[in-house]
Amino acid sequence: MKAAVISFPGSNCDLDLQWAVRDIAGAECDLIKPTQTDLTAYDVVMVPGGFSYGDYLRSGAIARFSPVMDALKQFAAAGGYVIGICNGFQILTEAGFLPGALQWNRDLNFICEPVALTVENAGTAFSNQYQVGDHLTLPIAHGEGNYYADPETLAALETNGQVVFRYANNPNGSMHDIAGVTNETGNVLGMMPHPERAVEALLGGTDGLGVFQSLINQTEGADVRGAR
């Protein structure tokens, strides 16, 4: 698998994400600039956490206009795999890759803590190394992580199996306890928890490693569950 991490001005999880994918999961992973307009060399493109362009206006609202986003739309439309984590999730919703929106947390506070998740769909490119019902603990760090969608969209997400991760104890008010969703075709995932911060036992556990191992399995056809 060859992956790219888009490093926007204000991104602060780009190096962490590259490290998790390259040094822990063992895949190729480049950092690329938001001015890049050709993504055809990659199997997976990752949009990291942080505060892209200072999150002025609102989270992800400026990053969505970066030149790389047009290339990312073409990449996703051609079936390439895209994952947005935290601010990356916000960027993907702003740019229309994913349904719904991320609002201020229910209590209007920035939340930085480990949270419990359950795996709702283990049949995606991002979750095939888990099993339905698996309990995960991943860190969150966000002020605008409260997932909102209208009732019709929420019903479609549930019916289509697009909810991949769900909070066990909802920390931020997200509707249906949603922590991570895919697009309708299943090749784009947005999630607020940070899997890249949970890939080593010494640093908070390895529950997030399965996200990256799933992508390796999807793109290379190699089941790497034994490495977890």
Curated annotation (Swiss-Prot):
Keyword 4Fe-4S: no
Catalytic activity field: N(2)-formyl-N(1)-(5-phospho-beta-D-ribosyl)glycinamide + L-glutamine + ATP + H2O = 2-formamido-N(1)-(5-O-phospho-beta-D-ribosyl)acetamidine + L-glutamate + ADP + phosphate + H(+); L-glutamine + H2O = L-glutamate + NH4(+)
Positions of the Glutamine amidotransferase type-1 domain: 2-225
Gene Ontology terms, MF aspect: ATP binding; glutaminase activity; phosphoribosylformylglycinamidine synthase activity
CDD domains referenced in this protein's UniProt entry, alphabetically: GATase1_FGAR_AT
Function statement: Part of the phosphoribosylformylglycinamidine synthase complex involved in the purines biosynthetic pathway. Catalyzes the ATP-dependent conversion of formylglycinamide ribonucleotide (FGAR) and glutamine to yield formylglycinamidine ribonucleotide (FGAM) and glutamate. The FGAM synthase complex is composed of three subunits. PurQ produces an ammonia molecule by converting glutamine to glutamate. PurL transfers the ammonia molecule to FGAR to form FGAM in an ATP-dependent manner.
Protein name as annotated: Phosphoribosylformylglycinamidine synthase subunit PurQ
Upper lineage: Bacteria, Bacillati, Bacillota, Bacilli, Lactobacillales
